[in-house]
Amino acid sequence: MLKEVDILLIALTSPIKIGVYENSKLIESIESEEKSSDILPIIFKDLQEKYRLQKLFYANGPGSFMAIKVAYIFLKSLSILKNIPLFATDAFYFNKNGPIKAIGKLHFVKIASEIKTQKLETAPEVIFRLPDVLDYNEFSTEAAPLYMIGAVGQ
């Protein structure tokens, strides 16, 4: 019998990161420098052979919109085909609310619960981390990408 797990995907930057969680605790992590559109089907095929997927989680932005779209379409398709619930939260959950590069000197920042763009002369390198324990309360069933973020520079 396969172990029941939840899967978390962070595909905002390279490398993509995937966490396997049992009872909300990280039991396996996977990183890949490959393009998410190429590697996600391979990784998830392996995961489905090894585990019984219960829930899917991902970072729905801000970040590379193309990477977010690929992740969303892939996970949403898997969610529908396999009847696995899909949940999302913003990327700030995975980088301790640090600024996230947008374009030029503009960065996405989260102030209170609002995501805005802000010009920063210098910003720390963005490092997204898989949490050791997944806090399910931080995620929502509203899993669509964060398209409501205004055009960069506005």
Task: Mark where each language-model region is.
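Oxyanion-binding and handling regions
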Residues: 1-39, 49-50, 81-154
